[in-house]
Amino acid sequence: MNIPYLVSLLSSACALIIGIVIHESAHALAAYALGDRTARSRGRVSPNPLNHIDPFGTVLLPLIMILAGGPVFAFAKPVPVYVNNLKNPRRDEVLISLAGPASNIVLACICALILRGMPGATLVSPLSSGVANLLVGFLFTAMSVNLSLAFFNLIPLPPLDGSSILVLFLKGRALQTYYEVQRYAMPILIVVLYVLPSVLHIDLLDWYFGVTVDPLFLGLLRFALGA
């Protein structure tokens, strides 16, 4: 049994579950604040992961991707929003969509603040022994996972939040074309995440994270370490 690998996997899984719960609860809270009580009445503002987990998107799909050895992504149950209850439906849908990724970025910043306040905190492996070292390693992992979760969800393909945001800026034929493309969202994601890197050695996700997640993570890392 590969204990170090299991510890690392458990740390990442815990960070991902926490990130997903915060992400989905933020959607529900934003909807409630903007006039729609549906998600809150259905228990979506809750720390209980079972209220947010989608059996396929949160459990089965990530397991398949881990076994396949490629990038891993997951999605939770969609937060129910009835646009007729919103004060300004077109604007509020975008704000609700942005609330999820924004909450993950805030959570990553909170992790950095906690690390900054920990005496003698240094960049350690999440596999290091000792409770303090395990906590430090987990916080660094949580920073990375939450930033990745935030920016991955901003990709403009359903069921990701970026799809709802992009619609605000499209009109006419462009909007119609986008709705047609949405039907092929999952095949497109599979091509981008697996086919292009393995066949053509073109890793669009790595490039995208390189210009979004990496600079922000390095900035938070310097802040956390007092560098």
Locate predicted features:
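Hydrophobic transmembrane alpha-helices and their immediate loop junctions
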Residues: M1-A227
